[in-house]
A protein has these predicted regions:
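Core catalytic region of metal-dependent phosphoesterases/phosphodiesterases
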Residues: 1-57
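Active-site environment of divalent metal-dependent phosphoester hydrolases
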Residues: 1-4, 26-31, 120-132, 146-149
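Active-site neighborhood of phospho(di)ester-bond hydrolases with catalytic His/Asp-centered motifs
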Residues: 2, 20-25, 86, 118-123, ...
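Short acidic-hydrophobic surface loop/beta-edge motif
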Residues: 72-80, 129-132
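Ligand-binding beta-strand-loop-alpha-helix segment within the catalytic cores
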Residues: 57-68, 73
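Active-site-proximal segments of metal-dependent phosphoesterases and phosphodiesterases across multiple
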Residues: 40-46, 79-113
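Functional cores that coordinate and move charged inorganic groups
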Residues: 101, 107-122, 127, 131-136
Length: 241
């Protein structure tokens, strides 16, 4: 969320041998949103609520509860190396502390409590490699669907981002930041076919790398123009999922 995945993405994930899951901010937003507990007056929160309504067309409350019932941080051992995994900070899955210009003391929180040798986090939608104060490795794999760039030239490349870490009995063999092409036109057509709310916002993210999810006036005008406000208000008043 936001996107076309819904049932399809859950079914795909169920086929993969996933051994580590952590709680992200979007899972929190979905959990609160389906309970209609977000701010119903703020355009960005109404944007989230309308997407929660959309998700509920295919995914049950029980499945959303399972998505939400994940730790903020976990650790895995690879030989002598301890790897910490979190969406953002160990005790907070939202905010701007870990953007690329973040304070060193905030990045050190990823590798000190509890201590680990390598920290992997998400949230900022940017591929990143940097170090803790004591030399620990801190990595971010980037974003598959909505990479973020401040630089206009870098923003021209919006391919899906991945990171592959390879370990052997001696330690970390390789770090591989990947970018993979996908059919953006096909995804946008699918979004149209599935009547994805706020299609214009999705288009801007996938095609131009511009993200409007916090642009209050833009979201307000779009919701009124396209009828998302009307659809959301009907759902909020219905008392039904």
């Amino acid at each position: 969320m936001p996107g076309t995945g819904r049932r399809r993405i859950l079914d795909l994930l169920a086929q993969l041998p996933i051994t580590a899951r952590v709680l992200g901010n979007w899972e929190d937003s979905l959990w609160y949103g389906v309970r209609k507990e977000l701010d119903k007056t703020r355009p960005s929160q109404r944007y989230l609520l309308r997407h929660c309504q959309y998700v509920l067309e295919e995914i049950s409350l029980e499945e959303i509860e399972l998505l939400h019932n994940q730790p903020l941080q976990l650790h895995r051992q690879f030989g002598d190396l301890t790897v910490g995994i979190s969406h953002h900070l160990p005790d907070k899955n939202w905010g701007r502390e870990l953007i690329h210009t973040g304070a060193q003391e905030d990045f050190d929180r990823l590798v000190t409590n509890p201590p680990c040798d390598i920290a992997v986090y998400g949230h900022i939608h940017q591929q990143l490699l940097r170090y803790g104060s004591d030399g620990q490795l801190i990595l971010n794999p980037g974003s598959i669907g909505q990479p973020f760039f401040l630089d206009a030239q870098l923003r021209k490349d919006l391919r899906a981002q991945y990171m592959i870490l390879e370990f052997d009995d001696k330690g970390l063999v390789d770090m591989d930041f990947r970018r993979v092409d996908y059919d953006v036109a096909a995804e946008l057509q699918l979004a149209k076919d599935l009547k994805l709310p706020y299609f214009e916002v999705y288009y801007e993210s996938l095609v131009n790398g511009i993200h409007h999810t916090h642009h209050q006036e833009f979201l307000r005008e779009l919701a009124q123009k396209e009828g998302y406000d009307r659809e959301l208000d009907a759902w909020l008043k219905s008392g039904n999922d």
